A protein has these predicted regions:
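Outer-membrane beta-barrel proteins
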Residues: 2-346
């Protein structure tokens, strides 16, 4: 299946790049500034974001459209995310440099400021692979081709050791195969009825050095919008890479995460939301060095998110409160974080 996927992507790229004349496009710059005051239990900090998008688009003489974007949204001033998307009658082909995430973990879409831990969290939630962690090539089916609003996307990353911000003529980094040599990511979405969005994704990394378990993940979501109310649910599962010969005193580790919530637009200016993320880390039992079997262990991290956003003029005032039990999958560890923000787009 992986060979077929790679062959199709190569064929599509070859056919798309068979052109001679390019119609000049226009360059635009968009962005925004967000000022924040974040407070933890024992800390406090101020910050101002650095977010600029450079965009250009045009059309080839063959009728193929193109769209280029590069972003400056890192702490430094280097381009860290870049994409080139070519639009054809048979779908879009894209070259993504640290872009084009296909994970469905935040598809449930509940959050006045942003979905759950995607906006703020006191600890990392192990949802699994997302292809935008790597430089990749993608194919997207055209809109309206399939019934029920169904769309499909596939992405392939040929080198998992490659770096973000790669420029033209980059030969890539030497592949260490620490968690895999290459990765493939699939995603489908549909809108079967008005207000309902559903979708799922699956990702796998192959060719890891001395591989015992592949790194793979899967997820699914559903979101329903009716009037001012949005409700959503998502589930993701993740199996990290594990090499052969790993210490046999610890079993295989896996993660399963449920995210759900509700959002209410009080009026055209004010939106409030509440959501939860429950992530379980499982360690399987294993036959130890003394021929005795260790016990299987489960640890559950629970996050609660309360958010509000108020739009006034061209600015958005926001507050996001994140309360976590068993922070970092550590039993008994509790953490809390509050972020006040002012965002202005330009």
């Amino acid at each position: 299946m992986k060979k077929i996927t790679k062959s199709l992507l190569v064929m599509l790229m070859t056919s798309v790049f068979s052109f001679s004349t390019v119609t000049a496009g226009e360059l635009s710059v968009t962005g925004g500034v967000t000022a924040t005051w974040g407070m933890g239990e024992d800390s406090s900090g101020l910050g101002v974001s650095n977010e600029l998008d450079f965009n250009a688009s045009g059309e080839l003489d063959s009728g193929i459209t193109w769209k280029w974007q590069t972003q400056l949204d890192d702490a430094g001033t280097v381009n860290d995310d870049t994409s080139l998307v070519l639009g054809t009658s048979f779908g879009n082909v894209a070259l993504m440099i640290s872009e084009g995430g296909l994970a469905s973990k935040y598809g449930y879409g509940v959050g006045a400021m942003g979905p759950g831990s995607d906006y703020s969290s006191t600890a990392a939630v192990n949802h699994g692979i997302n292809i935008d962690s790597y430089n990749n090539v993608q194919y997207h089916t055209p809109a309206g081709l399939l019934p029920l609003g169904l769309t499909a996307k596939v992405a392939y990353a040929p080198n998992l050791s490659d770096v973000q911000g790669a420029s033209a003529k980059s030969k890539g980094a030497v592949e260490t195969a620490a968690v895999g040599s290459d990765a493939t990511h699939y995603r489908v979405d549909a809108s079967p009825i008005d207000g309902l969005s559903i979708g799922a994704d699956y990702a796998v990394a192959d060719g890891g050095a001395n591989e015992r378990y592949k790194q793979e993940s899967a997820g699914a979501y559903a979101k329903y919008v009716t009037g001012p109310i949005t409700i959503g649910f998502s589930r993701s599962g993740y199996q990290p890479f594990e090499a052969k010969g790993a210490a046999n005193t610890v079993g295989a580790i896996s993660y399963e995460t449920d995210s759900y919530g509700i959002m209410f637009a009080v009026n055209e200016n004010l939106t409030v939301s509440y959501s939860e993320e429950n992530s379980t880390k499982r360690t399987s039992s294993v036959l130890g060095t003394t021929a005795s079997r260790t016990a299987a262990v489960e640890s559950e991290m629970e996050m609660q998110h309360i958010q509000a956003a108020y739009t006034i003029g061209g600015a958005t005032l926001g507050v996001a409160i994140n309360d976590t039990d068993n922070d970092g999958y550590t039993a008994g560890k509790q953490s809390k974080q509050t972020i006040f923000s002012l965002a202005i787009a330009f």
